Swiss-Prot record:
A GO-annotated cellular component: TAT protein transport complex
Species per Swiss-Prot/TrEMBL record: Streptomyces coelicolor (strain ATCC BAA-471 / A3(2) / M145)
A biological-process GO annotation: protein transport by the Tat complex
Annotated compartments: Cell membrane
Residues in coiled coil: none
Record's protein name: Sec-independent protein translocase protein TatB
Function: Part of the twin-arginine translocation (Tat) system that transports large folded proteins containing a characteristic twin-arginine motif in their signal peptide across membranes. Together with TatC, TatB is part of a receptor directly interacting with Tat signal peptides. TatB may form an oligomeric binding site that transiently accommodates folded Tat precursor proteins before their translocation.
Recorded topology in the membrane: Single-pass membrane protein
Compositional bias of kind Basic and acidic residues: 131-161
Single GO MF annotation: protein transmembrane transporter activity
Alphabetically ordered keywords of this record: Cell membrane, Membrane, Protein transport, Translocation, Transmembrane, Transmembrane helix, Transport
Length: 161
């Protein structure tokens, strides 16, 4: 109940209580508040016992905390039958990122070696950096123009517009 109250907030509440009720009435107010909280807890516990008795022995393991959606979902997802813990343990983000990094570095090495063999030194420089500026590609066929052919256009979908 009071898990999310910090030290500064607690001190603020105490100072505010002293200012509002005064040092003379404060002990009486604290006793009244604790007595009220105790009665509310007793009423809640007796209501839970009455509900459990009326539900019968089938619901002996019923927990009222499960009615809270967060705890219900947490309890259901931590169930071993689903195997979610195995999936979480098998998912290693650092390992996957290292694999992706290695794959990218492997492609950079391949492109720099193939770029230097084909005579294109602008693809990768000697220090391992890639030239990111756009440069027009040389046409493969001497008769090919800069305009894309009708086959190169993306398909047009009437339903998408």
């Amino acid at each position: 109940m009071f898990n999310d109250i910090g030290a500064l907030e607690l001190v603020t509440l105490v100072v505010l209580a002293v200012l509002v009720f005064g040092p003379d009435k404060l002990p009486k107010v604290i006793q009244d508040v604790t007595r009220t909280i105790r009665k509310i807890r007793e009423f809640s516990d007796s209501a839970k016992q009455d509900i459990r008795q009326e539900l019968g022995p089938e619901f002996k393991d019923f927990e009222f905390e499960d009615l809270n959606p967060k705890t219900f979902i947490r309890k259901q997802l931590d169930n071993e039958e689903l195997g979610l813990k195995e999936i979480r343990n098998g998912f290693d983000l650092k390992k996957e990122m290292a694999e992706v990094t290695d794959a990218v570095h492997g492609r950079d090495a391949e492109s720099s070696s193939s770029g230097s063999s084909s005579g294109s030194s602008s693809a990768a420089s000697g220090n391992g950096r890639v030239d990111m500026s756009k440069k027009p590609e040389k046409p493969e066929k001497p008769g090919k123009t800069d305009k894309p052919a009708a086959d190169d256009r993306p398909p047009f979908d009437m339903d998408a517009t």
